[in-house]
C-alpha cells in the first residue's frame, strides 16, 4: 500500500510542478476510489497472465488431442521407424521421434523461439553429458588402476599368456586364493593369450577382470568331456559328474573368450578341437548373483556360449557374441536347439554336467546392450537367446528381460523360448538378410521372436505366459522370415499360452516375394493384446489363429502389404476358414460372435490418396457394435460409411467398448477412457495483445485525471 501511495505522489508532482504535494492531504474515501480504479485496471492483465500460464484443463485437453493425433499419424510412425533404425538403442529412437515433431513435455507445439531455446538447452545438456561421460571414464580408469594394483595377477601365479603354454592351473590357483579373501577376491589378467586345456572352476565371492587385449583360448580337447572354459560347479578331471553346491557373487569382465570352434576344411569337425561335441565359455548352474559384462565371445562349436541353469540374478551386459560353427553333418532338428545363451531349469537332461535334477528354475535373468552376429571364421548364430526344453517336473524360468540388443541375421531366431513366465523383450533390433548374404541359412524359415511350445502330450504345464514384446525394430529382407511368432504349436499339446502383449513394434519388411505373415499368433488361450504396431511391407500383417478368450487388437498401422492386413482364422472339419476377412481401405475388426473388443485399426491403402485420407482419420479409435455372429465386412465403401457415422456420433470423443461373457449373456463395460471435448481456448481466456495496452492506458489516464482534479482543489484551499 505504501509503495502505491508513493507512486501516486510522484505522478502528481508531474502534473502540478513547483508545488509541494502530498497525497496524504486527500480524504480516505478518495484514496480508496483511486486504488480501486488502479486495481480494476490491472485485473485483466493479472488474470490473463495467470490463466495463460496455468490453465490445466485447456492445456491438458489440447495436449491429449495433439499427442493422440501425432501418435497415430503414419508419417510420425515412419519417422519413428527411421529414427529407431538409425539409433543403436531402439527405445531412445522411439522417444526421440517425439522431439523431432517439436512436442513439448505438456503436449503443446513449440514456437521457433522455443525450439531455439531447446537447441541451446540441448547443447548445454549435451556438454554436461559429455563432461559427465569424461568424468565417468576417468573414474573408471582410476577404479581399474586400483583393481589392477590390488588384485591377484594370474601371471604372479605362473601364467605365461603366450597362447602356447597351458595356463589353466595358474588361473585356478589365483581364483582359489581370491576365494580365500586374498586380493579382495579380485583376479586380474594382463594383456596376453591364456590357453586352458581343462575346465576352470569359478568360486563364490570372486571377481575376474581381463585387460581389453587379454584372450582366454579354449584348448579343452577331451572326448566325451565338456569343452567349456568356466563352470560355477565342480566337474572332475576324469569326467565324473557330481552334484553341484550353490555359488554366489561372481563377476567376469573384459577381454575375449575364444571358444576355438572354427571348422576344419571338410566342415565336419572343430579344426583345433577334433574330439569335442561342442564348445562354450560359461556353464552357470545353481548360482546367485552372477555378472558377465564387456566380454567378446568368439566361435563356439555347436554349443552354447553361456548356459544358465537353475540360477538367479544373472546379468549379461554390453557384450558381443560372434560366430557359431555348424558341421555339415548336423540335421535341422539338431541345429535349431543351439542357443548362444541358454536359460533353463536345473535338470540332468537340460544341464548334463551335474547330477542336480531338482528342476529349480532360473529367475531374474537380464541380457542387455549386447550384439549377436557372425565372426570372420564362423557363420552367424543359430539363435541368440532362449531354450528348447521344458517338463512338468521343472519350474518355469521367470522374470527374463532381453533389452536393447542387436540381433544381426540370426539363422533361426533372435529369441526363442518355451515354458517361460514374465518375459520382457523390449528395445531390441532384429535384422534378417536374404540367403545370398548369409553363411548359415534355414530353408524352412525363421521367426525372429519365437515363443513356441515344447512337444508335451503328457505333462500339463504353462507353456508361455506373461510375455511382453514391445518397442522392437525388425528389418526383414528374407521372404521366409516372420518377425514375431507366439504359438502353441499343436492342438494336441497340453498346457496354455496366455497373457501375451505385442505392442509398439516397428516391422520393416522389404522382401519382394514374402511368404510369411509379419506377426503370427497361434492358439493363444486368453488375454492377447496386439496394439500400436507399425508394419511396413510384407504379405500379411497380423494373423490370429485358433485363439480364444479376451483378444484386443488396437491401433495397429499397415503400409504397402500385398495380402491381408488382419486375419482371424479358426480350424474345423473342413480345414481352416477365416472368421473375418478384411479389404482395402479402412477395416473394422469384428471378432467371432462379438465376444472380443471391437476397435478400428488404421490401415494404409496402396495409393497415396488413401494414405492421406487415413492420416486425417488416424486419431480416431472408433467403435463398432455388431450383433452379427461371424460378421464379415468385405466392402471398403461400407466400412468408410460406418466410420463416418461413428465419427459424427462421437463428436471428438473416443470410446472403447469391451465385451465379455457373463453366464449366457453379454455384459458391456466401458473401461477405457472417454476423452473430454477439447475446449476452445480462445473463448475461455481473457483478452490479450493490444487490449492489454489499452487497459493500461485507460487506467493511467483515469488516475491522472482524478489526481489532477483533487490536487488542484486542495491546492486552492491551501492558498
From Swiss-Prot:
Subcellular location: Secreted, Cell wall
Biotechnology: Has potential use as a vaccine component.
Pfam families: Beta_helix (PF13229), Pect-lyase_RHGA_epim (PF12708), YSIRK_signal (PF04650)
PbH1 repeat ranges, renumbered to this chain: 287-310, 362-384, 397-419, 497-523, 525-546
Sequence motif LPXTG sorting signal, location on chain: 685-689
Domain of life: Bacteria
The keyword Transmembrane helix is annotated on this UniProt entry: no
Disruption phenotype: Cells lacking this gene adhere to and invade human cell lines half as well as wild-type bacteria. They grow less well in human blood, perhaps because they are more resistant to phagocytosis.
Residue numbers covered by the propeptide annotation in the UniProt entry: 689-719
Record field: compositional bias (Polar residues): 623-634
Residue ranges, compositional bias (Basic and acidic residues): 606-617, 635-655
Keywords: Cell wall, Coiled coil, Peptidoglycan-anchor, Repeat, Secreted, Signal, Virulence
GO cellular component: extracellular region
Chief location bin: secreted
Membrane topology type: Peptidoglycan-anchor
Signal peptide per UniProt: 1-45
NCBIfam families: YSIRK_signal (TIGR01168)
PANTHER family assigned: PECTIN LYASE-RELATED, PLASMIN AND FIBRONECTIN-BINDING PROTEIN A
General function of this protein: Acts as a fibronectin-dependent adhesin and invasin. Binds host (in this case human) fibronectin, plasmin, plasminogen, and human serum albumin. Where the bacteria adhere to human cells there is major recruitment of microvilli which seem to fuse to cover the streptococcal chains. Antibodies to this protein reduce bacterial growth in human blood.
Protein name: Plasmin and fibronectin-binding protein A
Amino acid at each position: 500500500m505504501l509503495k502505491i501511495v508513493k507512486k501516486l505522489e510522484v505522478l502528481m508532482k508531474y502534473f502540478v510542478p513547483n508545488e509541494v504535494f502530498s497525497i496524504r492531504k486527500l480524504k480516505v474515501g478518495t484514496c480508496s476510489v483511486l486504488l480501486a480504479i488502479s486495481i480494476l485496471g490491472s485485473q485483466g492483465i493479472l488474470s490473463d497472465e495467470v490463466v495463460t500460464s496455468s490453465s490445466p484443463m485447456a492445456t491438458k485437453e489440447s495436449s491429449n488431442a495433439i499427442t493422440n493425433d501425432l501418435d497415430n499419424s503414419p508419417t510420425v510412425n515412419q519417422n519413428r521407424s527411421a529414427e529407431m533404425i538409425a539409433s543403436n538403442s531402439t527405445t531412445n529412437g522411439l522417444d526421440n521421434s517425439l522431439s523431432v515433431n517439436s512436442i513439448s513435455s505438456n503436449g503443446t507445439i513449440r514456437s521457433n523461439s522455443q525450439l531455439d531455446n531447446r537447441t541451446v538447452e540441448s547443447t548445454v545438456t549435451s556438454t554436461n553429458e559429455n563432461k559427465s561421460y569424461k568424468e565417468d571414464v576417468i573414474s573408471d580408469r582410476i577404479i581399474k588402476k586400483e583393481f589392477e594394483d590390488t588384485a591377484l595377477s594370474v601371471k604372479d601365479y605362473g601364467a605365461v599368456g603366450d597362447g602356447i603354454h597351458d595356463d589353466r592351473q595358474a588361473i585356478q590357483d589365483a581364483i582359489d586364493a581370491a576365494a580365500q579373501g586374498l586380493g579382495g577376491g579380485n583376479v586380474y589378467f594382463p594383456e596376453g593369450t591364456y590357453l586352458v586345456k581343462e575346465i576352470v572352476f569359478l568360486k563364490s565371492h570372486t571377481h575376474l577382470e581381463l585387460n581389453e587385449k587379454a584372450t582366454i583360448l579354449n584348448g579343452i580337447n577331451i572326448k566325451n568331456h565338456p569343452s567349456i572354459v568356466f563352470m560355477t560347479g565342480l566337474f572332475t578331471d576324469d569326467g565324473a559328474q557330481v552334484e553341484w553346491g550353490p555359488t554366489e557373487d561372481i563377476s567376469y569382465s573384459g577381454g575375449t573368450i575364444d571358444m576355438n570352434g572354427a571348422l576344419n576344411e571338410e566342415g565336419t569337425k572343430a579344426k583345433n578341437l577334433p574330439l569335442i561335441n561342442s564348445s562354450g565359455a560359461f556353464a552357470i548352474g545353481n548360482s546367485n548373483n552372477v555378472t558377465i559384462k564387456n566380454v567378446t565371445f568368439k566361435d563356439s562349436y555347436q554349443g552354447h556360449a553361456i548356459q544358465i541353469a537353475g540360477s538367479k540374478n544373472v546379468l549379461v551386459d554390453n557384450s558381443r557374441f560372434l560366430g557359431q560353427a555348424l558341421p555339415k553333418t548336423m540335421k535341422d532338428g539338431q541345429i535349431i536347439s543351439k542357443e548362444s545363451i541358454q536359460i533353463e531349469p536345473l535338470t540332468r537332461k537340460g544341464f548334463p554336467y551335474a547330477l542336480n535334477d531338482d528342476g529349480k528354475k532360473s529367475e531374474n535373468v537380464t541380457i542387455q546392450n549386447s550384439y549377436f552376429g557372425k565372426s570372420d571364421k564362423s557363420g552367424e548364430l543359430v539363435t541368440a537367446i532362449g531354450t528348447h526344453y521344458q517338463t512338468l517336473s521343472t519350474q518355469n524360468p521367470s522374470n527374463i528381460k532381453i533389452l536393447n540388443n542387436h540381433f544381426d541375421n540370426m539363422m533361426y531366431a533372435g529369441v526363442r523360448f518355451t515354458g517361460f513366465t514374465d518375459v520382457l523383450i523390449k528395445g531390441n533390433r532384429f535384422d534378417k538378410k536374404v540367403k545370398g548374404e548369409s553363411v548359415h541359412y534355414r530353408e524352412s524359415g525363421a521367426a525372429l521372436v519365437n515363443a513356441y511350445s515344447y512337444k508335451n502330450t503328457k505333462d500339463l504345464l504353462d507353456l508361455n505366459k506373461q510375455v511382453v514384446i514391445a518397442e522392437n525394430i525388425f528389418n526383414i529382407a528374407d521372404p521366409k522370415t516372420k518377425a514375431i511368432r507366439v504359438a502353441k504349436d499343436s492342438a494336441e499339446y497340453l498346457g496354455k499360452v496366455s497373457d501375451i502383449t505385442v505392442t509398439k513394434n516397428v516391422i520393416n519388411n522389404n522382401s519382394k516375394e514374402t511368404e510369411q505373415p509379419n506377426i503370427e499368433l497361434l492358439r493363444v488361450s486368453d488375454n492377447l493384446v496386439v496394439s500400436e504396431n507399425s508394419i511396413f511391407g510384407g504379405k500379411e500383417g497380423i494373423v490370429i489363429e485358433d485363439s480364444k478368450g479376451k483378444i484386443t487388437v488396437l491401433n495397429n498401422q499397415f503400409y504397402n502389404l500385398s495380402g491381408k492386413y488382419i486375419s482371424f482364422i479358426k480350424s474345423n472339419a473342413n480345414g481352416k476358414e477365416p472368421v473375418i476377412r478384411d479389404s482395402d481401405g479402412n477395416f473394422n475388426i469384428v471378432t467371432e460372435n462379438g465376444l472380443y473388443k471391437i476397435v478400428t485399426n488404421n490401415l494404409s491403402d496402396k495409393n497415396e490418396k488413401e494414405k492421406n485420407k487415413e492420416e486425417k482419420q488416424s486419431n480416431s479409435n472408433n467403435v463398432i457394435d455388431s450383433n452379427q455372429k461371424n460378421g464379415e465386412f468385405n466392402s471398403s465403401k461400407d466400412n468408410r460409411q460406418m466410420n463416418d457415422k461413428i465419427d459424427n456420433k462421437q463428436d471428438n470423443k473416443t470410446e472403447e467398448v469391451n465385451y465379455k461373457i457373463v453366464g449366457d449373456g453379454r455384459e458391456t463395460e466401458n473401461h477405457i477412457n472417454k476423452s473430454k471435448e477439447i475446449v476452445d481456448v480462445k473463448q475461455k481466456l481473457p483478452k490479450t495483445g493490444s487490449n492489454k495496452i489499452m487497459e493500461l492506458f485507460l487506467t493511467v489516464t483515469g488516475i491522472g485525471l482524478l489526481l489532477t482534479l483533487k490536487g488542484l482543489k486542495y491546492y486552492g484551499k491551501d492558498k
